[in-house]
Every structure is written in structure tokens, then in C-alpha cells.
């Protein structure tokens, strides 16, 4: 095990920057090419996602493994916003580990599953692959407008089940404490799903898990790049910045609003989602091969506030 830290570490959201939001797979071949090239060059890769471990193993990792991951590659997958994790090497994937303290109580999870399957089967499907969270995802043949119109009602029904079970819940910024005044869970809607989860989960917890896991396999990079498509993804860079790492964040969907942060924010001109992800991965591959390669330029820009 070398004692020299790698020159760079990558902490990557999956949906948007890596997996196409349309196909929900790696649709751009160069993304898989560059991820493998970076990993085989000794750059630690972390996939930090709200998705399940099964989603990564079945939809995202196969093209990487097909291209050949070396024995020196360090790839960590943190799933369900920090509740589940596993590693990847040339032999394949390890068994997932679950932090059971972050799971929705079993009886409540069953009631939520029953509601999803019986009352909302024309709106969402129950994600059977989640181990700690309860997730209901929009049916692929349903329009976004129709889904979002009914999502509010779905979320309200989920809230009723949870509060009736004595759980303290946060939903859309409003807190509903339990009898002791505690709020330990949240209902977290996205544009294609609702996640029902412990409020300890988040992309910042995923970043913490990633650094801990990488520390067990070798030196930790001081310089990091995080990539995401939503405001919640900035929590990855927030955590790294707060812990004195040199970090910049790439926002692949900046039109939704770029917050003020104490670290640099990069954007890709004229590209969003996985097209933007492909552009920055290609630039980092070139940079690792030749350290004189500028990170900014050629369509990659430093975001300027205002």
C-alpha cells in the first residue's frame, strides 16, 4: 500500500451526472471509459447516491467491470444517502453493509409499502431494493405533470401513517414532533420520487462514510471534486470543506440555482446532466495523465455569483 496520497478524489452523485435521467443507465460510453481510466490510475472513486445497492450493481457498475478494473482501483459505493455501502474491485462487488439504526421501523415500512401498492399503484412503484429507506418512484409511462400533481397527496398520506405510529417527521420544511418532541424521520420528495428516511441520512453522511472507507484501504486525497445535479448534492462538498479538504463542486444543472459557497463551483457551458458529467470526467482523465492540463477552459467554467 503506497503512502503517497492520490492527487485527486472524486465523489459522484449518480442520477444526472453519471446515469442518464432518461434511461437511468450509463448512456454515454466515454463516462464508463473515463471512470475506469481514472480508477486504474489510482484516483479514488466514490458513488454517493440515494439509490439502492442493487441499482448500482445492476444498472451502473456492469460497464465499468466489463472494461476491466485493476487490482489497484479504489471504488466505494455509498447508497441510500449513507445507510448502505459496499466496495468494488477487479473481482466484482462486496456484500453490502447496512446501518440498521438508520432504517425505517419495520412495521411502519410495511404499512407504507401497503399504501404504495394498494392506493398508488397507478402513480408509483415500490422500490423493493431499498434496505433502510422506503421509496416510491414515478411510473415511467406517467407524465411529470401528472405525477407532481398527485405527489403532494401521496406525501400527506405517508405523513399520516408515520405520525399515527408515533414517529416525529419533517415534511417540506414543516416539523411534526413525536410525543417527546423529537423529529427523527423525513419525507423527502424529488421530481421523480418520494424517499421516506431517517433525517440522519444525507449526502454529507455519504461523504463521511466514503472518507472512512477509503482510509481503511490507503491514503486519502487532500484534493476532491464533487459532482451533482441538485442543491442537496452540495452537502458532499460542504462536508469536505468543513473538514479542511481542498474541494470544488461541479453542478451539472446550475439553472436551478447555484448557492453561495466558500469553495469553487464549476459548470459546463451548454451541457447538463450526463453530458456535463462526461465533459468533466474527460477533463479530469486528461489532467491526471498530464498535470499541466488546465481544469477550467474548453467549456468548463468557474461559476461567478450574480
Language-model segments: residues:
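A short, Lys/Arg-enriched amphipathic alpha-helix followed by its capping loop at the start of a domain
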Residues: 2-11, 30-43, 240-243
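A short acidic (Asp/Glu
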Residues: 56-60, 88, 136-140, 234-240, ...
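Conserved acidic, metal-coordinating active-site core of Asp-based
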Residues: 123-225, 232, 238
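Asp-based phosphoryl-transfer active-site loop
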Residues: 3-24, 47-48, 207, 237
